[in-house]
């Protein structure tokens, strides 16, 4: 069952100008240490940050709150599986909101996809609720833990 859908389009050049103007103040306010390390290792640093910015915006929309109700930028974090697939983790108020949205007997799965075509970065987030596996049953579709 689909619990929420969100999308966002970010301008890479705008993110680059923001990084140039505000530097660490912006990075530390919006991105986790893991997200910052990943972006700083990439040749397209601004594009990497822009995709993660868009993912956080899209996730906040899928949660049905936007960036309000106590949800902060760092409550949502994008990392990647070994395959490169992006995954979203939520903590704090975002995790609380996700728990509130998820029906009893279900688990929430956050699907995220990222793309860019300069000067645009886009993210799309779908929050799905799946029935919990019965005792002895294995849910083979649940994503592997993210690579840190």
Curated annotation (Swiss-Prot):
GO cellular component: cytoplasm
Biological process terms in GO annotation: fatty acid biosynthetic process
The UniProt record lists the keyword Metal-binding: yes
E.C. designation(s): 2.7.8.7
Gene3D superfamilies in alphabetical order: 4'-phosphopantetheinyl transferase domain (3.90.470.20)
Localization (cell): Cytoplasm
An example Gene Ontology molecular-function term: holo-[acyl-carrier-protein] synthase activity
Cofactor entry: Mg(2+)
Reaction(s) the record says it catalyses: apo-[ACP] + CoA = holo-[ACP] + adenosine 3',5'-bisphosphate + H(+)
Binding positions (Mg(2+)): 8, 57
SUPFAM superfamilies tied to this protein: 4'-phosphopantetheinyl transferase
Main location: cytoplasm
Keywords recorded for this protein, A-Z: Cytoplasm, Fatty acid biosynthesis, Fatty acid metabolism, Lipid biosynthesis, Lipid metabolism, Magnesium, Metal-binding, Transferase
Organism superkingdom: Bacteria
InterPro entries to which the protein is assigned, alphabetical: 4-PPantetheinyl_Trfase_dom, 4-PPantetheinyl_Trfase_dom_sf, ACPS, Ppantetheine-prot_Trfase_dom
Matching HAMAP family: AcpS
Main function: Transfers the 4'-phosphopantetheine moiety from coenzyme A to a Ser of acyl-carrier-protein.
Family as reported in the entry's similarity comment: Belongs to the P-Pant transferase superfamily. AcpS family.
Annotated protein name in UniProt: Holo-[acyl-carrier-protein] synthase
